[in-house]
Structures are given as structure tokens and as C-alpha cells.
Amino acid sequence: MSGLFITLEGPEGAGKSTNRDYLAARLREHGLDVVLTREPGGTPLAERVRELLLAPSDESMAADTELLLVFAARAQHLAQVIRPALARGAVVLCDRFTDATYAYQGGGRGLSVERIATLEQFVQGGLRPDLTLVFDLPVEVGLARAAARGRLDRFEQEGQAFFEAVRQAYLQRAQRAPQRYSLLDAAQSLEAVQRDIDALLPGIVERCRG
């Protein structure tokens, strides 16, 4: 059995973490070794970088600084968690990965795709997710959900225009590579979203055992 790398993507309030946990439980019912992780973060060092990225601050963070911190955390995460798990045949479920960088730093911050792609190749080599679930919903719905959770982090404090650009970047990436991306309507009820995940489950299990 070969490892499978599945990422869950989407803007704020899309329910990625909840549905990552749901998918993990369903895969474990099939006896699969599942590793749950997230970005930025996933290791103690990468989690400290996450704190730098998310904590509101009086000092404005340059877009290039943000981008480099994201990839620094990712390099550690790949070395310590993702690559070892895939090597032993596990299913890795990651809440955000490099698609988020193209969406947030590319779409939201306006950094060039070429700059991001250069770092992607340097840090990841040929490693890309096998499957990416994109949880899509209107920006105003996602921001309302995020606000209901409590104190907003540095990204969640951005305005609607930023998140519209993030959403469009995700949708464009999903449209360009439909063989890798599955687009899910996250504006539905949680039960409806999880029914959509269940519909994908047989194909995922088959790929894990193939």
C-alpha cells in the first residue's frame, strides 16, 4: 500500500478542520493509517512560525516575509512529518498546503505565481498532493463564521476584497486541474458537506490500496 497525500483547502470559515477530522475517522474505519496535520504548523518549530504569521501585531509584515515564513515552516513540516508518513504508506490529511500559498500570498497579497512556484520547487521538489478538497463558500458567509469563533487572527482581520481574491485564486486552480481537485460547496449544512465527502470515500480508499 502506498501513501496518499490529501490536502483540504478553502477560505476562512469553510470548515476544513472539522471535515478533515471527519474524513480521517471514515478512513480509519477502513483500517487505514491516517496522519492529521496542518499548515502553517505541524511540528513544534513550524507551530512557532505559525504564531508569528497569525498573531496580530503593530508591525506590518511584508508580503515577502510572510511568503518566506510560510515556506520555512513547510520545509520543516515536510522533513519531520509529511515525507516520513508517506514513506511508511500512511494517508496524510493536511489542513492547508501550497495551494493556500498561491491563494493567500498570490491572490490575496498579489505576489507573483512565478515567485511562489520557485519556492515550491525548492522546498518540495516533485512532491504535490494526490488529492485536494477545496471547500468553497461566499466570502461573507465564511467571514461571519470566522467572527463567530471569537478573536480574529491577522489574516481573518483582512477585508472582503482580500478574501474575494483568495477565493478566486482557489477556484482558478481547481478549474485548471480538475483531476487533482474536488470542489465542495461549504455553504451547505455540515451534514450535506459530509455526504459529499462520503461520495468521494470509495475512490480515496481504492487509491490507498492500489
UniProtKB/Swiss-Prot annotation:
GO MF term set: ATP binding; dTMP kinase activity
GO term, biological process aspect, one: dTDP biosynthetic process
Residue sites binding ATP per the record: G10, P11, E12, G13, A14, G15, K16, S17
Keyword Iron: no
Position of the signal peptide: none
Keyword DNA repair assigned: no
Gene3D superfamilies: P-loop containing nucleotide triphosphate hydrolases
A Pfam cross-reference name: Thymidylate_kin
UniProt-listed Enzyme Commission number(s): 2.7.4.9
Alphabetized UniProt keyword annotations: ATP-binding, Kinase, Nucleotide biosynthesis, Nucleotide-binding, Transferase
Protein name: Thymidylate kinase
Organism: Pseudomonas putida (strain GB-1)
